[in-house]
């Protein structure tokens, strides 16, 4: 009985994460805000509110990541003119992102990518946890107040 219960728990938990790299790739494009960084297994840096968000756009496995600063009216200001080029590749049933700038090249692995959650592991084994960005004031709220 205990084995059956354990197996059921494992199946349920494993089905909760999105590990299909093709689905992960479809979920990458969007505005993401950092929640925390797992530096080591017992060391986590929490971000309650970040001044910047990441915008990721990928089409046909090619795209970019750009830092943006959200405005109160729902728009965005580019934090800089720089962006990181991204090439997405599915290798050994894992989604890898290859970044390049004028100064560096590196690779990160997507661990989870759903509509609302993104977890990426970098070359130093740090895990970055993102959630889908939601403006503090949405245009829907403003319309209902008027």
Annotate the PLM regions.
Residues 2-8:
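Sec-dependent signal peptide recognition
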Residues 12-15:
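C-terminal motif of bacterial Sec signal peptides marking the signal peptidase cleavage site
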Residues 19-33:
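N-terminal helix-cap/turn-to-beta initiation motif at the start of protein domains
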Residues 45-90:
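N-terminal glycine/threonine-rich, aromatic-flanked beta-hairpin/loop signature
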Residues 62-64, 93-97, 117-118:
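Hydrophobic residues embedded in beta-strands of well-ordered beta-sheets
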Residues 77-111:
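An anionic, turn-rich surface loop/hairpin at beta-sheet edges
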Residues 112-116:
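Ser/Thr- and Asn-enriched, surface-exposed coil loops between beta-strands
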Residues 119-146:
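Edge beta-strand at a domain terminus
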